[in-house]
């Protein structure tokens, strides 16, 4: 009887873990390794799944990744490339079908964990929301065409192109972090975003900002969230230094001290193209990783400074 009860309890306990995508340049596999190492350094029990373009390719670039992940999955080639060109937005717009857990914390790999992320996961789970992302602003069409927090397209273009209601409130997300609980709501969000992305995209030449010749996933996720009336923000937070406090620190200029960042955030991002994140923070991350690897008798091989210098720029992939 006890065994049957245990099995029943396990079956209704939602699985929860971190999901990462690693494809393209070798630097993204190196970044993945640094991130999973930093997560597991602070908490070896956090579940991590990495989705690769090709396992052989990934392990040829960075064989050490397997030491720190629970599961490895493969992304279909048709979800990675468009006309034989790498298409990161396409991968992320197809993310839902690859989610391995009931509750998934998706992270872009260009970040480093500063402390145990389990309290972050717990807070996201306790919110009761099925979808949360890093939300930097909102817009309604009565505010005009300039949606300052959303760089991909002009507001009037989006409202006209997608035939949006005047009453819609559109969020602006940074999809570097997404909390996705599998269910009818999130499935509908991604279904709508995919339909817009593949069947009714804004022509690339008409975008406000170009992104390497491909379509940005955030644009279509923003529209889908507006259509479904979903607020992706974790409401307990307020804007703080350009970020929602307590999760991931994003910065284009030197601001908070290292101590304040560790105190207030779980991860430090180095997103964007080369030179986007200040070298001040890049060097700090390398110093931390160097000390952490040295403490276990290893070398910090994959320097953040080198990874950041060789990331995808807006014009090329």
List each model region and its residues.
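A glycosyltransferase accessory/donor-loop signature
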Residues: 2-16, 50, 159-317
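A conserved hydrophobic helix/loop-capping motif in glycosyltransferases and polysaccharide synthases
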Residues: 18-25
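Conserved glycosyltransferase catalytic-site signature
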Residues: 29-32, 89, 93, 175, ...
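Short, acidic, metal-binding catalytic loop of nucleotide-sugar glycosyltransferases
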Residues: 38-46
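Short internal beta-strands
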Residues: 48-54
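Short loop segments at secondary-structure junctions
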Residues: 55, 99-101, 181-185
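Active-site-proximal specificity loops/subdomain of glycosyltransferases
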Residues: 57-99
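GT-A fold catalytic core of metal-dependent nucleotide-sugar glycosyltransferases
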Residues: 90-145
